[in-house]
């Protein structure tokens, strides 16, 4: 699973550290992600999504569905996970 916000699509970006002598070295900036349980009132259920703290502010201001639509995302993020709670198991040997 990529380190990407499911609401805004923000992910890891890369760039340069620049020293005093202008020597450039590559580095990455990682997005501040959290797992958050959100209650969908119209569907009467909880969903767990990974979102950035910036998206959490937007979510509190606008609401979950409006925040996803405004960022060009899909409401499929809120769909129930087909295999939630099921772990992959190796086939049993006879």
From Swiss-Prot:
Q: Region Disordered: which residues?
A: 1-21
A Gene Ontology molecular-function term? Answer: structural constituent of ribosome
Per UniProt, the keywords (alphabetical) are:
Ribonucleoprotein, Ribosomal protein
Q: Which domain of life is it from?
A: Bacteria
A GO BP entry:
translation
Q: Where is the composition biased (Polar residues)?
A: 11-20
Q: What InterPro entries does this protein's entry cite?
A: Ribosomal_bL28 (IPR026569), Ribosomal_bL28/bL31-like_sf (IPR034704), Ribosomal_bL28_bact-type (IPR001383), Ribosomal_bL28_sf (IPR037147)
- Provide GO CC annotations from the record: ribonucleoprotein complex; ribosome
Q: What is the similarity comment for this entry?
A: Belongs to the bacterial ribosomal protein bL28 family.
What protein is this chain from? Large ribosomal subunit protein bL28
Q: What organism does the UniProt record list as the source? A: Leptospira interrogans serogroup Icterohaemorrhagiae serovar Lai (strain 56601)
- Report which gene this protein is encoded by: rpmB
């Amino acid at each position: 699973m990529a380190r990407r916000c499911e609401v805004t699509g923000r992910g890891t970006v890369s760039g340069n550290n620049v020293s005093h002598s202008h020597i450039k070295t590559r580095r990455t900036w990682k997005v501040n992600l959290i797992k958050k349980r959100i209650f969908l009132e119209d569907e009467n259920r909880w969903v767990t999504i990974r979102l950035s703290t910036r998206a959490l502010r937007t979510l509190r201001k606008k609401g979950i569905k409006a925040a996803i639509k405004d960022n060009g995302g899909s409401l499929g993020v809120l769909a129930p996970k087909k295999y939630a709670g099921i772990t992959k198991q190796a086939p049993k040997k006879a």
